[in-house]
């Protein structure tokens, strides 16, 4: 019997990109496919999103993987390069680089490149992670402008730290800082991630950087409902994680279920054992009561998540059988709900799917 399965709907992926483009017709789409395509498969996602204007990845290894399979679209590496060998590969494979520190500027000055490089200057407007400060950025921009190793115009970008917060004060400050510092700079601009895409239409500039929304998942989780209807109406979940019932047991009242005896049967009742666990990427900290979907109805998780199995309450599903499919998240059960129950975010759940899960592509 197959173990857990992640079904990837490539039609939904293409649909989501088309919706993004329709909602921001004046912007180019830089599709974020880092971290193995947010757990959906780097190459699979890139091939499905051939209509994206460019791809964003975290590191050079991801970019080279795409080039090796024949992806010819522009690719921008968010962390840039860190030595001369990497910089040479950027030029050889036509990779765009985000420039976020003085060491990278120095490398550009001293390295002889076979061809000029497309770069984006990262301006730190408040994320306080990577990038040049607002005060440093004009001088760095002027340095880059004089480099013969760099294609012109230079891209200008920032990253929003709090765009998914209903309190807009800090994000509006970041956007104001970015527009102010780049006012006299010439070059394409990029500000918004998925949350910013919905919440800050004034920041939909030359390039947008959709990430989690490409995969049909709200960047706001389940708590921020301002865009809930729009997201549910226009976007479709791409991944459905499912596993099969491998055993059905009738338990007595007060029988405990699973490690630690944390959950006991309130009455005589049937339970099902499902072939998925934290060894597959299902969150160990999902508590009893976390929903799963069985034959179109919600059933609650009971007891602790094991490495290879979970148990679910079958009292609402007396006709369930061994071999039935159980949906852990995806079509009909948003992953945002599971993330909330487990005290995490949907991004983490998607990225933690392990290698023993079988991936299947569908077009639906």
From Swiss-Prot:
Instruction: State the Gene3D superfamilies in the record.
Output: Alanine racemase, Lyase, Ornithine Decarboxylase, Chain A, domain 1
Q: Does the keyword Cytoplasm apply?
A: no
Which InterPro entries does the entry link to?
Ala_racemase, Ala_racemase/Decarboxylase_C, Ala_racemase_C, Ala_racemase_N, PLP-binding_barrel
A Pfam family of this chain: Ala_racemase_N
Question: Which EC number(s) does UniProt give?
Answer: 5.1.1.1
Pathway per the UniProt entry: Amino-acid biosynthesis; D-alanine biosynthesis; D-alanine from L-alanine: step 1/1
Give a GO cellular-component term.
Answer: cytosol
What CDD domains does the record tag this protein with? PLPDE_III_AR_proteobact (cd06827)
Q: Which GO terms describe its molecular function?
A: alanine racemase activity; pyridoxal phosphate binding
Which cofactors are required for activity? pyridoxal 5'-phosphate
Q: Which GO terms describe its biological process?
A: D-alanine biosynthetic process
Q: Which UniProt keywords apply?
A: Isomerase, Pyridoxal phosphate
Q: Which family does it belong to?
A: Belongs to the alanine racemase family.
Q: What is this protein called?
A: Alanine racemase
């Amino acid at each position: 019997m197959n173990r857990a399965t992640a079904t990837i709907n490539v039609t939904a992926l293409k649909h989501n990109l088309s919706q993004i483009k329709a909602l921001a017709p004046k912007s180019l789409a830089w599709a974020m496919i880092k971290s193995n395509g947010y757990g959906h498969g780097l190459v699979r996602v890139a091939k499905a999103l051939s209509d994206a204007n460019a791809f964003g990845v975290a590191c050079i290894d991801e970019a080279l993987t795409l080039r090796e399979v024949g992806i010819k679209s522009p690719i921008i590496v968010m962390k840039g390069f860190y030595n001369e060998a990497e910089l040479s590969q950027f030029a050889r494979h036509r990779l765009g680089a985000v420039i976020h520190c003085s060491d990278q500027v120095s490398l550009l000055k001293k390295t002889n490149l076979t061809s000029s490089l497309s770069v984006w200057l990262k301006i730190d407007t408040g994320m306080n992670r990577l990038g040049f400060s607002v005060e440093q950025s004009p001088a760095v921009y002027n340095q880059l402008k004089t480099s013969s190793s760099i294609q012109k115009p230079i891209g200008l970008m920032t990253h929003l730290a709090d765009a998914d917060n209903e309190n807009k004060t800090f994000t509006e400050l970041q956007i104001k800082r970015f527009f102010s510092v780049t006012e006299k700079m010439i070059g394409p601009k990029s500000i918004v991630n998925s949350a910013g895409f919905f919440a800050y239409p004034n920041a939909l500039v030359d390039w947008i950087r959709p990430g989690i929304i490409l995969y049909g998942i709200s960047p706001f989780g389940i708590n921020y409902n301002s865009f809930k209807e729009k997201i549910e109406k226009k976007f479709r979940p791409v991944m459905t994680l499912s596993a099969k019932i491998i055993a059905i047991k009738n338990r007595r009242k007060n029988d405990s279920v699973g490690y630690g005896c944390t959950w006991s049967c309130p009455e005589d009742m049937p339970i099902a054992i499902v072939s998925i666990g934290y060894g597959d990427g299902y969150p160990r900290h999902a508590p009893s009561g976390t929903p799963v979907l069985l034959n179109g109805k919600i059933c609650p998780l009971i007891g602790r998540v094991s490495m290879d199995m979970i148990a679910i309450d079958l009292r609402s599903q007396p006709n369930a059988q061994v071999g039935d499919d159980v949906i852990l998240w995806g079509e009909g059960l948003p992953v945002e709900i599971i993330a909330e129950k487990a005290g995490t975010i949907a991004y983490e759940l998607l990225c933690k799917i392990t290698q023993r899960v079988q991936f299947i592509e569908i077009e639906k």
